Each structure stands twice: as C-alpha cells, then as structure tokens.
C-alpha cells in the first residue's frame, strides 16, 4: 500500500523520490531546526528501534547520541530514565543492564515506546506498535499513545487493524498502491467505507 516508503521518507531513512512532507507548512528538517521534537517507533523493534545486545541504560543513551550529547560519558541520566520507565510501565526485566533482546516482546515494546515519548515529542510516529503483543501489553501501549494525544502531541499511527484505527484515530488516511485514496473522520467512518478506499473502489485519489 506504500506504508513503508511513507515511514522511511518521513523520518528520512531514505530520501523521497518526489513530493514533500510538511507540518504547519514546514519540512521535517526545518521543524527539527526549531527544536521541535520528532519521535519514531519503528515496526522492527530490535532491528531499527533498539540494540538487542544492549541493556536499557545504553539504549536510552542512543537517543542522546543523535542529539550530539556525550556518548557513554553521562550514564546517570539514562540510567535514571530506564529505572523510571521500569517503574511506570511495569517493565519486567532483571535490571537496567540486562540485554533488551532477552525480554518478552511486550516488554521490549514498552522500552522502545517509553524511550521515544520520554523526550516529550511534538510529533510521534508509531508503526504497528502492538503487533505480536498480548492483550495487556497492547492496552498499555494504547494508553501511552492516548496520553500523548492528550498532552498535545500529533500521533501518527501506522497500522492495518481497522477496529483499532477507528477506536484510536481522529482522522484516518488510507493508502492504496502507494497513493492516498482518502482521508476520513475516525469518529464517523465505517470499516466498509475504508475498505472501499483500500481497494480503489471508493473515495478519491490524492497525490
């Protein structure tokens, strides 16, 4: 449907072949220059999100590394952050130094989402955030995302479960064949309406 290229283009893993992405008339690069924080929770938790062989403390430090902060020098702040996440999100782990790759899928996702929202982002993109998780872990993640919405963050939820999308989203953008086939109100849209857009038999076509 074109979801992966959209994710990659938005967070700039790969440069887009055409078009542009803007928020309030500004590109992602311009937004970052203003100090507005963008966070991303990728679909591949241990491939793109976290380093499996590292503990929570070191994985917390990776976000600071992207900001140009001293790497592997200040360990107190990320360690305190890791300990706080363990307490607040009820992450089950032997300790902050235990490699995250040894944790269950639900706990790994809590670590990843917790790290990304700890920076108080203005825009938070999450891709399939509850895929493969049990029901309790899924609801924990949903709660965290809803809390971000309440705090004023723009949450971009990438997914395919229509029941979840209709429950969580204010607006739903439907992609088909790599193009936007419609944008609907999540409060009033139906699965049938969205399904037609997904198969190009309903809705318009946006470039």
Which residues fall in each region the model found?
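Glycine-rich phosphate-binding loops of nucleotide-dependent enzymes
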Residues: 1-207
């Amino acid at each position: 449907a074109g979801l992966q290229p959209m994710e990659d283009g938005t967070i700039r893993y790969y440069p887009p072949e055409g078009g542009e992405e803007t928020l309030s008339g500004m590109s992602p690069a311009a937004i970052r220059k203003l100090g507005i924080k963008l966070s991303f929770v990728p679909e591949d938790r241990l491939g793109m999100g976290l380093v499996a062989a590292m503990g929570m403390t070191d994985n917390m430090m990776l976000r600071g590394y992207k900001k140009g902060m001293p790497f592997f020098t200040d360990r107190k702040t990320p360690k305190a952050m890791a300990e706080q996440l363990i307490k607040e999100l009820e992450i089950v782990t032997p300790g902050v130094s235990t490699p995250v790759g040894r944790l269950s899928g639900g706990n790994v996702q809590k670590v990843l989402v917790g790290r990304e929202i700890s920076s108080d982002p203005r825009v938070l993109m999450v891709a399939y955030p509850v895929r493969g998780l049990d029901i309790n872990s899924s609801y924990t993640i949903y709660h965290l995302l809803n809390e971000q919405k309440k705090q004023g963050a723009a949450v971009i939820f990438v997914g395919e479960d229509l029941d979840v999308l209709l429950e969580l989203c204010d607006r739903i953008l439907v992609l088909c064949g790599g193009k936007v086939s419609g944008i609907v109100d999540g409060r009033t849209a139906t699965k049938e309406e969205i399904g037609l857009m997904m198969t190009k038999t309903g809705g318009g076509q946006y470039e």
